[in-house]
Amino acid sequence: HSEGTFTSDYSKYMDNRRAKDFVQWLMSTKRNGHAEGTYTSDVDSLSDYFKAKRFVDSLKSY
């Protein structure tokens, strides 16, 4: 039982650490002056992907 708790706590820690590292990366690249357009493009691409995925999933449900 304690091993599972440790694993869960460690996973949460690593998720938080990765999120903090990602935010730091975004902040540092934005300071360099070229992240905004790249970030917007990536978000748009991701948004389009999820819209398409939802559409395909809705077709599969019929």
From Swiss-Prot:
It is found in: Secreted. It comes from the Eukaryota. Its main location: secreted. Induction: Produced in the A cells of the islets of Langerhans in response to a drop in blood sugar concentration. One of its GO terms (cellular component) is extracellular region. SMART domains: GLUCA. PANTHER family: GLUCAGON, PRO-GLUCAGON. This is Glucagon.
